[in-house]
Amino acid sequence: MGYVADIADPRTGAHRRATLADAVLLARLMHRLRNQDILTTLVQPHDVPPSLEPLYSYLVLAAESDKYIGGPGISTTAQASAIVDMATLVTGADGSGGTYPVDLAFSPVSPLILGAEVTQAMIAVAQRGGVVCEILPCPTAATTAPAAVAAAAAQQHAEVLAGVALLQTVAPGTPVYYGPRLSAVDPRTGNVASGTPEVSVIAAVLLARRCGLACDCYGLTSDSKVLDAQFGYERAVNALIGLMARPRFLSGVGEVQAGAATCAEALVIDDDILTNVRHAVSPRPWDRDALDVDVMVEGVLSSGGFLGTKHARRYVRSEFPVPAVGYRGSLSDWLAAGRRGVVDAAAERAGELTAGEAVGVPADVGDALCRLIEDTASRLGVDVRPDPRRILAGEV
């Protein structure tokens, strides 16, 4: 997942600022996608005070999903402390027995700077214990990192290891993982280019593995401003490159316009892309059952071919992934249905998936989460803020 400020129209690319209502809708959609194993905050709602935004975002995810929730972006010690408290309430985990309530990401400033405020928050949460930390550098080749991919990956590696070394110095044994976000640059404009084949992610995953660290790398990326053919081929190529290295986590789902915005349709299409890419990199069975010679003889001799065999019925679904929105019917049926494209199908699918009710949290947990937000707001002196109970009541 990413962390974007805007909602984009999938056909025109026009932007508007994301709201708390958008965060709720997108969380509900992500919960119901088949390839979304972990949920993290996708948008920064502008109608929430910035100092409290991670807390509201976590509350939204907790109310909308019972999947594992990754922590939102953290900038201050107050945010980090409150998120850990909220996650402990939701999960019941406290770090004992190797089970942790949440992971929190901390970003160095490239090149090779550990910012004071973020570093203080990272140290405080590590010394408190009971949390997993991700070191998340975001260098850009040719601007905040060298232009050569090898050199840029080496700098990024040093930035991650600096964070790891600091964590293990102040709180030995703190679980930590590797979050590379190295991006390319368009030499014609100087803008960040997200649609290029991101081969650096393979290098990053291998470097992380060499150090014994789990890796969260980017996969689905694109520079396209709308959901068009460019969006599809760039995201499919980069998802495949990302998964080829076998990272522990693959990020980027739902982002459009090089990570500047998102939309529900992008999430649905990305889910279809991931269905195909995950199938492509998964090993196919070559055991005795898959290569059953008796079944081959039966199919060859049968007047109905192989379709009538139990073997075919058993394997047809696992061997041939079924798309949620991709079209596989005949041309005549497609023409008769009005020539609907994948964006239309994705919009319809998103509507179906978000029509259900929120998963919700127990009432006592919900009350405690809201009190944590209110207490944090009081300590920070934030008087004007949305009522968090409206999120739990489905009134946002």
Model-derived regions: residue spans:
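Helix-rich catalytic cores of soluble enzyme domains
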Residues: 14-248
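Short acidic (Asp/Glu) and glycine-rich catalytic loops that position anionic groups and cofactors
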Residues: 101, 140, 182-185, 215-219, ...
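Glycine-rich, N-terminal phosphate-binding loop and its surrounding beta-alpha-beta segment
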Residues: 1-10
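Hydrophobic alpha-helical bundle architecture
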Residues: 204-308
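A diffuse structural propensity rather than consistent per-protein peaks
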Residues: 16-19, 115, 263, 287, ...
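Catalytic-core signal marking the mid-to-C-terminal active-site face
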Residues: 265-396
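Short juxta-domain linker segments that transition from a proline/glycine-rich
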Residues: 1-2, 22, 31, 275-276
